[in-house]
Amino acid sequence: FISKTALSVLVVEAKEDVAEGSTKANSAIVHAGYDAKPGTLKAKYNVEGNLMYPALAKQLGFPFLNNGSLILCFDEKDRPDLEALYQRGIQNGVKGLEILERDQVLAMEPHINPQVVAALHAPTGGITCPYEACIALSESAAQNGVKFMFESPVTAIEKMENGFRVTAGNQTIETRTIVNAAGLYADEIAKMAGGIERTIRPRKGEYMLFDKAAGTLATKTLFQLPTKMGKGILVTPTVDGNLLMGPTAEDIEDKADTATTQEGLDDVLSAAALTMPDIPRRQLITQFSGLRAHDLAGDFFVGEDPEVKGLYHALGIESPGLTGAPAIGKELAERIQKDLGAPDKVDWIAERKPIARFAHMTDEQRAKAAAENPAYGKIICRCETVTQAEVEQAIDRTLGRVTIDGVKRRTRCGMGRCQGGFCMMRVAEIIHKKTGMPMESITKKGAGSALCVEEDTLCR
């Protein structure tokens, strides 16, 4: 949204690519908005962001599915909580909410626990792919003149008369305005700039991802009644056809601790079994965890710092942050444009064209694609039917450092049953040929994850 203005914009990123951190590891849910406390910023941006997703996904070419959600009640004594959730959703302005009885729920989702007594149906709920959405937004910004600086963690911010001096990586940047959207580290950036004091506690959520063979066991996103720690363990299809279960909710201290644990995964299976008793454990293909930026104040902080002019925050953006992100970005961009008196960009490009997916093509489209570009005729990832042409395009379009996981997030190469066992080194070879990077410099996910070492190193 800020790229719609004539402002000069630089995105400073600590990691080697976009869509790192919490963006790549969350539930991928576009929430309807029934859960957030009425009157909070979480409630406001949830409902506003939800309404923006269909058009934004179409405009920028990332996946979105309006599959709806069910909040399940398994005990009659909990029915008042379900009805309270319905009333909260009405207060928040959520459309189409209805309470369904047992037979209606089971007709809609036959694989869930038959002990269900009722459910809140939220038809405006949806699912997306968070990293593809972020990549699409970043590419759109780049094609409209926004610059990116990677592997540049911010280490110092100095307030000057007409703005700020920011030290990031090995560079110094002078700017009139800062937007603090640093996720787990937003409290540290705020403190560095002399702004508001907030405390962000990482809240770990562990997930289990199942093969596409299990993807049809649920069509809607299935929640249990929420608790003070969050929306609980969900069972949901993904936009790519898998089945996802999780997350746990554990407050931790280490902002870099994304390790999965046996206890966490046991908790996911145990809790998810209440929703879906016959969990297809043989179809489990991977586990992962993500960290939510939980602000101890309990709500988002969006807007200009009350003490430091020119410092804007998107702080404490935990769930429903993915849903609210478009609305938050739009509002901040409009505020900054107004405050700086910047005109609109006259040649703004509205649409972004995604990589054409071979797996989604008809036979006729595949034949045409291969005739125009023979690389579309060579399969690199058998599990997800990803071609060499798609891998090459992903490499060309990467804004930061090219990595195996960066290609994976742009193409799904390595996201199937074998989790890259067949295609990982083939992707590395294509990166080597396309970029000239030595094989020992190519990493899976940045520093510390090299795939190859020099031969003489092995002999030491």
Predicted segments — roles?
Residues 136, 230, 239-240, 251-379, ...:
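C-terminal catalytic lobe of FAD-dependent flavoproteins
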Residues 157-162, 166-246, 250-261, 270, ...:
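Flavin-dependent oxidoreductases
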Residues 28-108, 117, 232-233:
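Dinucleotide-binding Rossmann-like beta1-alpha1 core, especially the glycine-rich loop
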Residues 408-424, 441-460:
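Short Fe-S-cluster ligation motifs
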Residues 256, 387-398, 421-439:
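Iron-sulfur (Fe-S) cluster-binding segments and ferredoxin-like electron-carrier domains
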Residues 37-38, 44-47, 72-81, 120-142, ...:
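Short beta-strand to alpha-helix junction loop
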Residues 3-25:
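Glycine-rich FAD pyrophosphate-binding loop
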Residues 120-177, 185:
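Helical element adjacent to the flavin cofactor pocket in flavoenzyme catalytic cores
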